[in-house]
UniProtKB/Swiss-Prot annotation:
Part of the 50S ribosomal subunit. Forms a cluster with proteins L14 and L19. It comes from Kosmotoga olearia (strain ATCC BAA-1733 / DSM 21960 / TBF 19.5.1). The keyword Ribosomal protein applies. This is Large ribosomal subunit protein uL3. Keywords: Ribonucleoprotein, Ribosomal protein, RNA-binding, rRNA-binding.
Length: 213
């Protein structure tokens, strides 16, 4: 396993063998290794990566004291984002190492995790794709929920009932997407298809956990 943190820049078109491919361009890294975890130490094999380096003044405003102490102990400059990524062999990394987009190669399959666009408070039709009521003369409801349960028994609404509420801003992972282009010099990775989230949203790219055969 290997991975990197980045920001979604947007989508564009790349032509490959005469075919037009819609790709998402991601500004990946540079990320700094802040901590190593090993199974031998009673934990699991993983590394913690810092992304988007901060000045000391900005770090004091944006980070909590425990996080600042963590960077001080590792002798690494403070970073805005701190994420953990599972790896097979943590001994391949050292605290302070810098990881860039060059860890991935063109044609490789990856899993991309992002946070979907927040849509705010929405109704059941938009949130859960309900059909709604009849749009005819005499109908008393059109975009409402309908029945939500029985009357006397159980005389309550069951937990988990699909109802209006906040929609979006959820962590979503897209599996087995192809790396089309890698520009390690500029820290750019072009991934086939769409990636969850808005432009400028945080994404985590990992080597595919269950690649297609």
């Amino acid at each position: 396993m290997k991975g990197i943190i980045g920001r979604k820049l947007g989508m564009t078109t790349i032509y490959e063998d005469g075919k037009a491919l819609g790709v998402t361009v991601i500004k990946a890294g540079p990320c700094t290794v802040v901590q190593k975890k090993t199974a031998a130490g009673g934990e699991y094999n993983a590394i913690q990566l810092g992304f988007e380096e901060l000045s000391p003044e900005r770090a004091k405003k944006l980070l909590t004291k425990p996080i600042l102490k963590k960077f001080e102990a590792a002798k690494v400059k403070p970073h805005r984002i701190l994420k953990e990524i599972r790896v097979e062999n943590p001994d391949e990394y050292n605290v302070g190492d810098v990881i860039d987009a060059g860890i991935f190669k063109e044609g490789e399959l990856v899993d991309v995790t992002g946070w979907t666009k927040g849509r705010g408070f929405t109704g059941a039709m938009k949130r859960w794709n309900f059909g709604g009521g009849e749009v005819t003369h005499g109908s008393k409801f059109h975009r409402e929920l309908g029945s939500v349960g029985n009357h006397t028994e159980p005389a309550k609404i069951w937990k988990g009932k699909k109802m209006p509420g906040r929609y979006g801003n959820e962590r979503v992972t897209v599996l087995n997407v192809k790396v089309v282009k890698v520009d390690a010099e500029n820290g750019l990775i072009a991934i086939h298809g769409a990636v969850p989230g808005a432009r400028g949203g945080l994404v985590i790219i990992r080597a595919a956990k269950r690649p297609r055969k």
